[in-house]
Amino acid sequence: MAKSKKPVVVGIEILKKNGLDVDSLIKELVINASVEFTAYYYFTLLRANCTGMDGEGIKGVIEDARLEDLSHFESCIERIYQLGGSLPKDATQFIKMSGCEFLQLPPNPTDLTAILEKCLKAEQGAIVNWDKICNMTLGKDPATYDIAKDILAEEIEHESWFLELLYARPSGHMRRR
């Protein structure tokens, strides 16, 4: 079925013509996929350790961010493969490239402030990562730009949730979507 001849992919050729380094973009998308997947995993652990009366209210916020991180991971995968890339075959290597070791449970695994600080740090890192993709693709790759722009907006929203909880800083939302 599969032919050994490498196909011409017009969608990729146009991006190159637009001045985009497609290989660099794939590399950044794989890193972002790793970050989103690892954040999803660690947010699962952090959420589970939000205990007691105060923890119950925080679980929902972490759960919303966690599920959106899974969606971000899925968006990355689709675009990586469309661009001719792939994920690493070794899951350990994939997780290590995320740099998310800081998201492990705090020494006191039910310390809600420490959990929220970890969540905030994760969201702020994601903002930097997705801003980088937006800057790489602006005016060169509208498909990836739209994905990155939408994810960036969600990461900024998540940051505001955790800032609100940690610093009593109004976030502007009436309820999470």
Q: What kind of feature is each model-predicted range?
A:
Residues 1-177:
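Iron-associated oxidoreductase/ferritin-like identity signal
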